[in-house]
Amino acid sequence: TTEGKVIKCKAAIAWEAGKPLSVEEIEVSPPKDHEVRVKIVATGVCRTDEHAINPSFKEGVFPVILGHEGAGIVESIGQGVSKFKPGDKVIPLYMPQCGHCKFCLNPKTNLCEKISKIKTPISDQEVMSDGTSRFTCKGKPIYHFMGTSTFSEYTVVSESSLAKIDAAAPLDKVCLIGCGFSTGYGAAINTAQVEPGSTCAVFGLGGVGLSAVMGCKAAGASKIFGIDINKDKFPLAKKLGATDCLNPQDIRKPVQEIIAEMTNGGVDFAIECIGNPDVMKAAFESTTVGWGTCVIVGVAVGEQSIPFSPMQLIMGRKIKATFFGGWKSVKSVPKLVSDYMAKKFDLDALVSHTLPLDKINDAFDLMNAGKSNRTILVF
């Protein structure tokens, strides 16, 4: 047994910004009080992982083990842990749910005060609660990422950053519930609160955007526009529920004007899944005056602003944003896994590539070239 011992294993380390990740042997310490050590079985690669090593993101810390969309099996537990035992299937949660802070006790939000830097959550939780790391490589401590660090064969997480899931769940699919799927699907269901018979537009058809399309369809939308500059994304978007797909580069006028023409003045709901302020503006302007709602999902790196006029708000449009799709994580993730097992939605369609950890830089290249929806790394 490895319980109580340091584990040597492989992990992908980001040593500095703008450089490829390096797969190295690391040491993972045993879990301390209220911590759990998890053997990661599969992890998705998300745009947010790329943001964290982007030179324009000034909050990044190095060296760091990225990854926040994983699934695995509990290897051992620290003192005081009662909800988990070795062998449990689990999903690490970058959005913790402690269950007793002012946010956890309020049904209006899924935030938790354990995310201490609510200003820039993707640079948060880079050490454990005692201020130290559980990872070392070549004698150096390595930072954690978002409290999860799933680009490692073993990771250590807080017990409030972990959900126990169905023992029969396929970890190489349900890992997507750790971020991308839940974020997009929840943006439609929870944050936008898409209504039956409504019209929707989803900007950006990567893994998150395709999940938002699924959410709009599940909520009963009658028309769902999928917008992307990569037309290779359109066939899958249509399979998952998009009724119309538009490429802004093929249109002579702004896409929001085309959408307004096709919907008698604009859609009821728009969801931006890219993280580009100009696209956020287009999404907002594609909604109808009177009651249009725009939900921002994409993470914009650095000091950027959305350029729109306050007058557009006076005319009854609303702009909202979402983090982890509005799901209270510990409570909702097991239910989402059960819904997947009951075939209420199709995660398998989102997985375009499966690669070993050693090929992690290929996964980033595929994502940056727009050639993947979601790549899963299997250990």
From Swiss-Prot:
Subcellular localization, as worded in the UniProt entry: Cytoplasm
Residues binding Zn(2+) 1, per UniProt: 46, 68, 179
Free-text comment on the cofactor: Binds 2 Zn(2+) ions per subunit.
Residues given in the record as NAD(+) binding sites: 204-209, 228, 233, 297-299, 374
Modified residues (N-acetylthreonine): 1
SMART domains: PKS_ER (SM00829)
Source organism superkingdom: Eukaryota
Protein name: All-trans-retinol dehydrogenase [NAD(+)] ADH4
